[in-house]
Design a protein with these regions (language model features):
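N-terminal, polar/charged subdomain of small-to-medium soluble alpha/beta proteins
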Residues: 1-115
Length: 115
């Protein structure tokens, strides 16, 4: 299966379970691994035969700006739903990294979804 990777996208969002986290934007980092058949696009050189990754990036930024999730797992699930809403995608892996999620460590969640 062919793949498109969008990695290292920094996002600011309200996320977390502690009361002090509910009133401030925090940084998370999004990585997407998108399963898609790229055979046609590799020959045609036409955007219509693939997905517009700039558009997906904008949708992820909008999700971060408008959401107020408690869990990065929930953010990852919604991000996967957005990716899978594209007809040409067949699956995706979403990785969310939350620096300083605990007092001593960075936390990372990896979620895999398929159609």
């Amino acid at each position: 299966m062919d793949k498109i990777f969008i990695t290292g996208l920094p996002l600011s969002t309200v996320i977390g379970t502690y009361p002090e986290e509910r009133d401030l934007q925090q940084k998370i980092i999004l990585d997407l691994e998108i399963d898609i058949d790229l055979a046609a696009a590799s020959v045609s050189d036409d955007l219509i035969d693939t997905i517009n990754y700039a558009e997906i990036e904008e949708k992820m930024i909008k999700l971060a700006e408008e959401s107020h999730f408690y869990l990065i797992e929930a953010f990852a699930g919604k991000a996967a739903d957005i990716v899978l809403s594209y007809e040409k995608t067949t699956g995706c892996t979403v990785t969310i990294t939350k620096p300083n999620a605990s007092h001593r460590a960075t936390v990372k969640v990896v979620l895999r979804r398929e159609k």
